[in-house]
Amino acid sequence: MELFQAKDHYILQQGERALWCSRRDGGLQLRPATDLLLAWNPICLGLVEGVIGKIQLHSDLPWWLILIRQKALVGKLPGDHEVCKVTKIAVLSLSEMEPQELELELCKKHHFGINKPEKIIPSPDDSKFLLKTFTNIKSNVSAPNKKKVKESKEKEKLERRLLEELLKMFMDSESFYYSLTYDLTNSVQRQSTGERDGRPLWQKVDDRFFWNKYMIQALTEIGTPDVDFWIIPIIQGFVQIEELVVNYNESSDDDKSSPETPPQDSTCVDDIHPRFLVALISRRSRHRAGMRYKRRGVDKNGNVANYVETEQLIHVHHHTLSFIQTRGSVPVFWSQVGYRYNPRPRLDKSEKETVDCFCAHFEEQLKIYKKQVIVNLVDQAGREKIIGDAYLKQVLLFNNPKLTYVSFDFHEHCRGMKFENVQTLTDAIHDIIIDMKWCWVDQAGVICKQEGIFRVNCMDCLDRTNVVQAAIARVVMEQQLKKLGVMPPEQPLPVKCNRTYQIMWANNGDSISRQYAGTAALKGDFTRTGERKLAGVMKDGVNSANRYYLSRFKDAYRQAVIDLMQGVPVTEDLYSIFTKEKEHEALHKESQRSHQELISQLLQSYMQLLLPGDEKFHGGWALVDCDPSLTDAAHRDVEVLLLLSNAAYYVAYYDDEVDKVNQYQRLGLEDLERIEIGPEPTLFGKPKFSCMRLHYRCKEAGGYFHTLRAVPRSPEEDGKDTLQCIAEMLQITKQAMGLDVPIIEKKLERKSSKPHEDIIGIRSQNQGSLAQGKSFLMSKFSSLNQKVKQTKSNVNIGNLRKLGNFTKPEMKVNFLKPNLKVNLWKSDSSLETMENPGVMGNKVQGESDGDISSDNDSYHSDEFLTNSKSEEDKQLANSLESVGPIDYILPSCGIIVSAPRLGSRSQSASSIDVSTHAPSEAAAGPGSELGKGLESPLKKSPSADSIHTRTGFTKPMDVYCQRFVQDAQNKMNDLSEIRSVAQKSEEGSHKTNRVSNEETQSEPMGQTPPRPSQLNVSCSVAGPPFLSVEPVHSVLSQKTPSSGSSLLELEAGLCVTPSSESSSSRAVSPFAKIRSSMVQVANITQAGLTHGINLAVAKVQKSPAEPEAVNEIQQNELKNMFTQCQTRIIQI
């Protein structure tokens, strides 16, 4: 269409239609094309593709008209519908201000033989002269207030800055798409329900994804049919369309194409190889739209940040198959202050304030998609845990049977760049994927519909989310192609097709990431190639730094533009950004100085801590250990401190989760064999960094080394100079000992070191000592680490009989033993312990974000521990100190499990297999009696170990509620419970309610593969019995009068009994207090894959001193307040 400039209007004309845009008030008018003759001196400026809308960047400034200046054809969807991408826009001020250089395509009708369009604006020199004259006249007539002049200049500066950001948003990201004949906002399934709807396209669109709805509002309000021609619905997101050929004889075109662009298929003349069309369409919601650190979580209307619906289309002949997934921020009120690199998330509102908005979000989702399968990928420990816990709690409170909650700790399962382990997730939920189906449409109509949707999220809903969504969509696509006969049943996707498919999803992730975070997606190399390379790790580090910079100031302008586009009031003081921008350079320099000071402090403190008194400190450096075998998937690299003394060098591993060093290694200089310096080992691309490899011998054996690189001060540096200085220092120091070490410059080989030995763990600050452990690699990089953290509940009950002397109502008691710590939880009527963090790499007590404990106040007393222990207790305590954790492997499923810790009162249920449905009763046998040496005073009571109260809960939600009501309403129970334990010998009444409920969908036990019924773990005599799983009939036949009253109702027929092998020692009841309100029991198939089944095991342990009537009243209140928990919970 042609664009004309007149004195009072800009006129868009195509055929017999014309749209007049006022340059005085910004009004839009539909007029016939013949009215162009009435315009004052119209001049054709060029051709445009369409109208996006208009925007006002400030209330005191004029409107701007946004036009599509240039488009690019993306491809054609089934039905020959063209999809175009907006590549360039033109912005016109609807004021008397003359337009700038628009660079429009010239109209051949009005500009034949002319290279540039004619202008009615004067020359630049004349413009400046007239502007200066006008300014002088204005200043002479009315001397304006200097303050007003300053404000006017600030407004103009702000407008220019926002206008610049608007142009970048449309022209740099290439994330806006439209089609004149196809509804990109609606999926195939939603379109199929309204095929007979005769309304125009813009009236049938999904309001959530109609990105320019507010900007085009002046046209939609006109209401006449003539306006339909001018309204073009635009989506923000991603669209890519590719045609693939199923040919197993072709090889990959890796050498002929770059990872960013898929290989071009040559024309297939052989009809034997079937073709199919693949289209990927991602639509970003316009509600709560914005940038990463500006928009998080949910708003008051239930809209979440970064909400994207992604549809994968497969078209074969006349069959169109569609599968959709969504992503969106965790729907609770949370935020991250983006002025710190990798800031910690925080909850902004309480649980009660969040419930209504959480319900509003999922009620809308269920209304649209019927069912929701939530796949939560946030870390289940560390700084992300607070968000994951809040999410799970809201899901349980929402309590809807149409929801399924799947928890998959992505970083835990994919440590060490093993992103192919995502298959563990897809295999575990394979049945859910198949049951969800997909939409299938042909010429006759709808064949089947997709029943439900996957809602995948991580913290940002970018990197991890894209990898998982691509994996799920791949499973669906293979099922679809096999269903249509395009792929053989037992064959995978051809290499060439697979590569193109991976590239499409990687491009999708990059596009969404640019829109939300400002940079390309991390982990994109895995999505693109299926492999995680060291170059991708380093690239991720650069992108993380870029995201941090962008979030500081540039995002503020981008967020303001997005809000203005959507008609949302701009809440941030944009004028203050000017000052912040000026301060940015100084702040950046200051932060660099602060960083150097922090490193100096760290080096000084750990030099004093690690170096013996007889060694002299020669130097220290902060480096990065880039050995691929040590690379942590959660943080992409491992920061280390390299300390050098006159006799040894120390490699101290820094944990940024707790801002401290938790493990280190001391290596004598005499064992240093050689030093290699060269480009980083990469498989593709040009190396960006130089690395230093320190080879050393351990116990006269070689093959050990550390691969380190320096942190460059600028992007242009590779850190080689720093590494050479370090190498020379090492060489000079060793020469002072009368030895020498060669320094070799060469390209480093891509290989991994042998597992480092003699790793020393630094214990908690409270203990102030060092413990040596040899499980550093396992604790820091294996998936066992978090499982061990979550199943730690070791308690020496023998030490608790004198705890009744305490009078403080809320406190936490820490017994400062070398490897045992007892916590009295304020909000949890339980006593638990946490293992010594020295070996397993746990966080320091008192961590700022409360990853391990949410309690703030603690009471430490070594004297109390000494005075309260008997000689027998001390002997048992000494035996506990001498035994460390042992880990085992279940051979039937290949899952690493942690052996029960000595003195534990409970064991994780995650290693117990449950596969029967018949309800049964589990009883504690004779092995549950208290061991010799601990029977006084507990065993003096004849029924102390056998009298239990059977609670008839059959609903998981009742159990869940029981726990939280006790926590909320009975904070004093902790004290009363402890006192009652101390007075057991006089009162003689010890009653414990244990309730657990299980919902399982596994197969009968006879159909599951055999696996060991008991973990036969060798241990010392003082060790407790281990949990065992036995058939139902065996337990019923073993019940005795003394144990028959100790019951545990399990819907799935789980029967857990203590082993009798260690009956001579103190036996720990398997039904002891489980602090977690949600424990997952998984059914393991022959392939070793986890099919999650939810088991809600909540503690319902009332104080013996508490009146039973009070407890019954609370239980009745819970049953009236909550119904059965119908949400399926799966933890993988």
Curated annotation (Swiss-Prot):
Disulfide bonds: none annotated. Residues 857-872 have a biased composition (Basic and acidic residues). InterPro entries: hSac2, Inositol_phosphatase, SAC_dom. Disruption phenotype: Animals develop normal corticospinal tract and raphespinal tract. Mutants show greater axonal growth and functional recovery after central nervous system trauma. Knockout mice have normal cardiac form and function but show augmented hypertrophy and reactivation of the fetal gene program in response to stress compared to wild-type littermates. The modification Phosphoserine is found at residues 714, 827, 830, 879, 882, 908, 911, 1103. Signal peptide: none annotated. Its main location: membrane. It is found in: Membrane, Clathrin-coated pit; Early endosome; Recycling endosome. Residues 908-918, 994-1005 have a biased composition (Polar residues). Induction: Up-regulated in the absence of histone deacetylase 2/HDAC2 in the heart from HDAC2-null mice. This is Phosphatidylinositide phosphatase SAC2. The gene is Inpp5f.
